[in-house]
Amino acid sequence: MSIKEQSLMTPYLQFDRSQWAALRDSVPMTLTEDEIAQLKGINEDLSLEEVAEIYLPLSRLLNFYISSNLRRQAVLEQFLGTNGQRIPYIISIAGSVAVGKSTTARVLQALLSRWPEHRRVELITTDGFLHPNQVLKERGLMKKKGFPESYDMHRLVKFVSDLKSGVPNVTAPVYSHLIYDVIPEGDKTVAQPDILILEGLNVLQSGMDYPHDPHHVLVSDFVDFSIYVDAPEELLQTWYINRFLKFREGAFTDPDSYFHNYAKLSKEEAVNTATSLWKEINWLNLKQNILPTRERASLIMTKSANHAVEQVRLRK
């Protein structure tokens, strides 16, 4: 079926890997193998080929969208007779735990910052906007961490709203996976970047998720382009367990780690623990809150084994 025929049946254009890779055109590779190695996650094999075939075409597409947005801003400034404020273009990246959102975000940050039109690219994760553990404990939400109710949504929305309003310096809280908590007094200042990449579980939620409050303002109201990183559930579970096992031998061995006790588990005990955590928390959150937002994304990247993207769907 041709792309034109597909477009009559779905709001998305669908590309297999080779079709998408061809859209790279003549965009040069601007990352070295060493730089790519530093960008990949603990559980991923990010290759030069993956960057060339998947992320370079995506960076080219985003550059077109961002350039168009800048032209639109210039038209508005000309109409109003004003000198425009620096308003960042916001890209959100959503998807399940362990799917590789952070790697996607880091690769895009590296690639987009090398385009001459927009050098300043900031990356913020929504983990920092989780309520502190003390608040979650008081509300009985420690086992709901990552669910919508565990976030300080008012602060997150104010953060993106201030950026889109041209506020010169906006602060974002920072999360530590070592202590499994928001770092007290650890705020990061974001000063009018050209692009902000916002990565997190909950960035695609819309008013449909809050039927009791039809006037609810959400992060998605301020996002210019949204990406959903997708994969089959059985792969997500496998990746989550494998990541847990690697943390057990790495980060969990740090005495300061919140999960230090997990480092003492046998491999069988660790697999059982990770499986329980996946089924009781992360899978539940995926089914209830994350997966239902997938079709709201501007672009859906679907992964197969080894975190290789096999299909891309782009909203018309």
From Swiss-Prot:
Keyword Transferase found: yes
Descriptive protein name: Pantothenate kinase
Class of enzymatic activity (EC top level): transferase
Organism: Salmonella gallinarum (strain 287/91 / NCTC 13346)
NCBIfam families with a match to the protein in the record: panK_bact
Protein family membership: Belongs to the prokaryotic pantothenate kinase family.
Keywords: ATP-binding, Coenzyme A biosynthesis, Cytoplasm, Kinase, Nucleotide-binding, Transferase
Entry GO MF terms: ATP binding; pantothenate kinase activity
Pathway the protein takes part in: Cofactor biosynthesis; coenzyme A biosynthesis; CoA from (R)-pantothenate: step 1/5
Chain positions recorded as ATP binding sites: 95-102
Record-level GO cellular component terms: cytoplasm
Pfam assignment, any one: PRK
GO biological process, one term: coenzyme A biosynthetic process
E.C. no: 2.7.1.33
Record SUPFAM superfamilies: P-loop containing nucleoside triphosphate hydrolases
Keyword ATP-binding on entry: yes
Subcellular location: Cytoplasm
Catalysed transformations (reactions): (R)-pantothenate + ATP = (R)-4'-phosphopantothenate + ADP + H(+)
